[in-house]
């Protein structure tokens, strides 16, 4: 049975309370979640010997989460990832969005959902957070009601359910930006972690980190993760701009994806600790980001230091980047009367 505790962790500059929820199961594993950014703050899991460690990145103080560039552990939206040149057309009306990442719009803008207080409550063994995004918020059309529900169980499985409804057709693509280091937060590079993905194709990217619209076969390339492989050997490859991006920062297409069906995305594992996390999602793609720009941009960490590049890997289940400008991609549009519902599941365990 999961026990949930809560306390006031801090305050925003506007005087809003930052609540920290601790979800602890019968095995002693625990997950901490904050209502600032609907964020995963820590995940404490056993290694193969039963020794506990926090396996996600995060900051020592709640203020560290204010507008951090890494969006560590936070729920981003309205639209995760990039929209080319901050331009989109919805039902014939063009919107100019904030350009906040090179020439592109990223994660819904500076004041995106990751940088706001969410209303929050406990429902039995889950924590539910909600947010109202007004019509025109960050120049997106339509009023959007958003909910993020976090469920944790005695089998060390963390499930996130994102729901959204709108009164005008709009763009929605929600994900969580948690960074994993299965050796333990603050233990250094994740480049020797091994990843397996249920993906035989990747999106071809241009040098501005926008999909060209083409799908590339991953077989025989540094982006072929159909079998477990570490990140390090491919980190300097010229394939699909890996070197240009300083590492992996790419969307992988999930094989056999069907709308509204939860399917396996893949598994991340770390040999020394024996920890692993299996990821499931109802989304059509997953962004693998090896923390290429963590150095210098993060506040004081939970372990009291500073992160270096590659100290964590984000596994971001989501729709294709820039999908609103690619009719051949799965549609990111949400219409009145429809309910956006997407799930992400992180199943933690160990291997021999």
Question: Where do the protein language model's features map onto the residues?
Answer:
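An exposed, glycine/acidic-rich loop-and-rim segment of catalytic or binding clefts
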Residues: 1-352
């Amino acid at each position: 049975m999961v026990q949930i505790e809560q306390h006031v962790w801090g305050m925003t500059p506007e005087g809003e309370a930052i609540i920290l929820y601790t979800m602890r199961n019968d095995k002693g594993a625990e997950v901490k979640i904050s209502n600032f950014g609907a964020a995963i703050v820590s995940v404490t899991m056993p290694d193969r010997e039963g020794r506990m460690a926090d396996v996600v990145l995060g900051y020592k103080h709640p203020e560290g989460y204010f507008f951090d560039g890494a969006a560590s552990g936070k729920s981003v939206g309205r639209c995760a990832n990039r929209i080319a040149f901050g331009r989109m057309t919805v039902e014939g009306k063009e919107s100019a969005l904030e350009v906040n990442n090179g020439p592109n719009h990223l994660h819904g803008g500076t004041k995106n959902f990751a940088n706001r207080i969410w209303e929050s409550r406990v429902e039995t063994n889950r924590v539910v957070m909600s947010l109202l995004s007004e019509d025109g918020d960050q120049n997106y059309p339509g009023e959007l009601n958003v909910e993020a529900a976090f469920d944790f169980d005695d089998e060390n499985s963390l499930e996130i359910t994102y729901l959204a409804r709108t009164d005008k057709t709009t763009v929605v693509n929600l994900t969580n930006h948690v960074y994993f280091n299965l050796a333990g937060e603050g233990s250094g590079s994740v480049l020797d972690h091994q990843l397996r993905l249920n993906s035989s194709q990747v999106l071809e990217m241009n040098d501005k980190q926008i999909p060209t619209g083409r799908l590339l076969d991953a077989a025989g390339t540094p982006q072929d993760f159909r079998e477990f492989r570490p990140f390090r050997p491919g980190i300097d490859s010229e394939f699909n701009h890996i070197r240009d991006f300083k590492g992996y920062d790419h969307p992988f297409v999930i094989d056999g994806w069907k709308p509204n069906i939860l399917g396996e995305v893949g598994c991340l594992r770390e040999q020394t600790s024996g920890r692993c996390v299996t990821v499931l999602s109802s989304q059509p793609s997953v962004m693998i980001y090896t923390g290429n720009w963590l150095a210098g941009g993060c506040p004081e960490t939970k372990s009291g230091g500073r992160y270096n590049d590659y100290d964590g890997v984000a596994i971001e289940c989501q729709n294709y980047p820039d999908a609103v400008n690619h009719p051949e991609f799965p549609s990111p549009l949400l219409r009145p009367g429809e309910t956006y519902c997407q799930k992400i599941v992180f199943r933690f365990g160990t291997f021999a």
